[in-house]
């Protein structure tokens, strides 16, 4: 690289040449000239786009990338969404094999040639499953189902017929979910999974109750709704939000129905040499000592920075709750927990104050399954706060839930969420669909069994993510500091940090003055058919971009990195061109 860092050069046949490779197309100085001549200064359109959600902006970027594809005949690379490009195969194979067994059980009950059959019968069904699997003993799915059966019997002494009957009915989907909150054996398996993956094998004493939901998004909706319905949060109350964060956590509190006063606690700590650590300042966190703060919302590991909360921050939060704000309600979204070795959720450290959301979507490649859980300790502050409500509020809630049970005062908050999820009146048909629950069960047991047998699934998953992350940053020419708290599912790249490191403060000020932060994401879409999201939309650094490391191939991140660097260098070249005098080499 030249000392001024404007372009990356190499010598070819005696000529100095700038070169960028993207999408299997190698371009030279002509591409640089195209960037230099494209004066996309701040305009009203970009300012307007800064006000919308990054996920809605993504649709506009895709349109621009599509136009670029038609014009330049290349492939769009969409790194704007966290939908992974992998699937966990064995638990799915087991699901389909279990479906074959369940259909045999239906036909065993009764069958007619018109395409009708009965339903699975409980008596002796576990022995029949054993024979079914024995006949297919060479199939990996059969071996896995046998391990699942043995695990539940050996670890939890469940009744074999009762459990296998639940499994068969689940995969067939012939009944309403009973219990509505989560099925018995599904809850047992997922409780063990959460203890292993979210609590690092050190769960809190007592029972963690689960509510199976239609993905993490449904869990969010149910939590916000029930907190308000049960007067735990009133319109206009003060809450805290740890940022950057998944955009809906920013947008939902602003809705007229909630209109919460939101204080953001930014992950603003920097290293001595000006690099983001993506951790929280103790002074900012100290604001939570004020009991005016009713609730704290966090995604941990974070989205988009993709870092777990540091141990000293967790310790400080524990101290704040124990000494200053014991009624603080915490909602933690831990969907990326499995990407940080040794991760411990706030649910493990502050179990009585915490609602945990966990989705199976990201780890198992299952966004389309819409499978998640809300986890709460049975002894929790939410139930206690309901007990302390004024008599008038309790009377209102008795009227709300009175059609479900006569002793509403003994109805736990988690069960109120179940009822609220179906407008109370439809509580009798509440619950996640049975096929979703059995696939969730198989996902959970797969991770548990795999860990006992060498943890190969997790290790390979981490290897894939880390290779993509390294490729992205190496191709940009930026430095990625080692950090054991990094999940790596996303990468948030603050372009101003690198602009200053490469070109200095004067260039940064010029960039801010002449361009909108969205200019980068628009140019990537328009000029290179790349879709990334603006980090400012997550209340992160204004000039940052979010790249998902989950949904493209390793070679694609090399293309993305080089394209990002090319645009940064093009800004610098234009800045130098604007200076009264530029020194030559």
Positions of the model-derived regions?
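Short, flexible/disordered intra-domain loops and linkers
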Residues: 47-50, 87-95, 174-178, 269-279, ...
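Short, solvent-exposed loop/turn segments at secondary-structure junctions
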Residues: 82-87, 217-219, 245-247, 301-305, ...
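Conserved core of the PLP fold type I
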Residues: 116-325, 337-351, 355, 553
């Amino acid at each position: 690289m030249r000392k001024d860092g404007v372009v990356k050069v190499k010598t070819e046949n005696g000529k100095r040449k700038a070169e960028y490779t993207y999408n299997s197309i190698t371009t030279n100085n002509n591409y640089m000239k195209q960037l230099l001549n494209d004066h996309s200064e701040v305009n009203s359109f970009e300012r307007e786009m800064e006000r919308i959600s990054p996920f809605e902006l993504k649709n506009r970027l895709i349109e621009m990338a599509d136009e670029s594809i038609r014009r330049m005949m290349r492939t769009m690379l969409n790194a704007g969404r966290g939908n992974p490009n992998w699937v966990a195969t064995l638990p799915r194979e087991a699901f389909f094999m279990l479906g074959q067994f369940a259909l045999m059980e239906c036909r065993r009950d009764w069958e007619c040639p018109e395409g009708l059959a009965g339903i699975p019968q409980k008596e002796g069904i576990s022995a029949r499953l054993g024979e079914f699997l024995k006949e297919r003993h060479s199939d990996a799915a059969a071996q896995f189902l046998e391990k699942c059966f043995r695990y539940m019997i050996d670890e939890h002494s469940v009744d074999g017929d009762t459990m296998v009957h639940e499994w068969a009915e689940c995969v067939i989907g012939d009944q309403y979910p009973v219990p509505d909150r989560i099925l018995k054996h599904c809850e047992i398996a997922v409780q063990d999974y959460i203890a292993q993956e979210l609590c690092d094998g050190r769960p809190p004493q007592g029972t963690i109750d689960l509510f199976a939901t239609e993905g993490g998004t449904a869990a969010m909706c149910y939590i916000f709704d029930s907190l308000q319905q049960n007067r735990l949060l009133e319109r206009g109350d003060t809450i805290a939000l740890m940022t950057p964060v998944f955009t809906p956590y920013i947008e939902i509190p602003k809705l007229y129905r909630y209109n919460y006063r939101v204080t953001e606690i930014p992950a603003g700590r920097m290293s001595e040499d000006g690099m983001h650590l993506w951790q929280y300042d103790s002074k900012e966190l100290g604001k939570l000592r004020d009991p005016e703060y009713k609730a704290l919302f966090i995604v941990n590991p974070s989205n988009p920075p993709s870092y777990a909360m540091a141990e000293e921050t967790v310790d400080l939060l524990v101290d704040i709750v124990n000494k200053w704000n014991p009624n603080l309600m915490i909602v933690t979204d831990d969907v990326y927990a499995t990407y940080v070795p040794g991760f411990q959720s706030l649910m493990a450290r502050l179990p009585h104050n915490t609602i945990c959301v966990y989705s199976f979507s990201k780890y198992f490649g299952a966004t389309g399954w819409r499978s998640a859980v809300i986890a709460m300790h049975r002894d929790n502050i939410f139930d206690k706060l309901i007990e302390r409500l004024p008599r008038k509020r309790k009377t209102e809630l008795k009227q709300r839930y009175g059609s479900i049970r006569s002793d509403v005062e003994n109805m736990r908050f988690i069960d109120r969420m179940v009822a609220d999820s179906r407008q109370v009146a439809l509580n009798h048909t509440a619950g996640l669909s049975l096929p979703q629950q059995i696939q969730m069960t198989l996902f959970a047991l797969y991770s548990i069994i795999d860990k006992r047998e060498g943890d190969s699934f997790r290790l390979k998953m981490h290897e894939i993510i880390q290779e993509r992350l390294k490729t992205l940053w190496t191709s940009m020419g930026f430095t990625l500091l080692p950090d054991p708290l990094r999940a790596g599912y996303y990468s948030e790249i603050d372009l101003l940090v690198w602009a200053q490191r490469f070109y200095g403060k004067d260039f940064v000020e010029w960039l801010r003055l002449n361009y909108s932060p969205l200019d980068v994401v628009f140019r990537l879409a328009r000029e290179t058919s790349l879709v990334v999201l603006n980090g400012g939309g997550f209340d992160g650094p204004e000039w940052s971009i979010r790249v998902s490391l989950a949904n493209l191939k390793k070679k694609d991140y090399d293309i993305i990195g080089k394209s990002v660097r090319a645009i940064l260098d093009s800004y610098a070249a234009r800045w130098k061109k604007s200076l009264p005098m530029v020194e030559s080499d």
